[in-house]
Amino acid sequence: AMAAEANTISVRGIAKQEVAPDMAYLTLGISVKGDTAESVRTQVAEVSQKVRRALLGMAISENNIQSSSYNLYPDYENVNGKNKQKGYALNTTLRIKVDDLKKLGDIIDKTVQEGVTNVNQVSFALSEESNVHRQLLAAAVDNARAKAAIVANAGGRNLGEMLSADISDYNGETMVAAGTNYKRSLAADVAAPTQLMPGTLKIDASVE
């Protein structure tokens, strides 16, 4: 074992690439308050239905529209130093997969017009990320082999076969616009259209 360890070289190969995203995940929030639990449930149901209709009208598939949370709770106010329940509040979120980034700004504007109160998160991604990652892994192996060859040649040895590989995680998603709040008003009708600049995704892979 000692001899085998003495004849091994441990190196780390790295490969990186920046790519333009071609899809996004959009998390929309609907928040309402009312006197009764039934009233807030009704309000949210009506807004959710309008938002879904708007999304379907923009060619967003039903399969790409998912409810991700639904929280109903008492709404309190402070009266003379004491908390007094004045009604109920309900928050729900929808997670939307957007395959056409050109539609992203219009989707946000249209759903806000239909009652969405929060854009909680926008994350950009690459539909073919797994293919890019496989290419980067191969490049990382080549990078590691080149480093090992330099060390072996410097020591007067020939490089043999790779004995083991430890693959690290990689990151290929970027998030923007977390916690953006929207208030419906007359001014919103003349506001400039929402524009988001996705930039590039940094994907990396390493082999050790």
Explain the meaning of each model-derived region.
Residues 1-114, 118-208:
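Short, charge-dense linear interaction motifs
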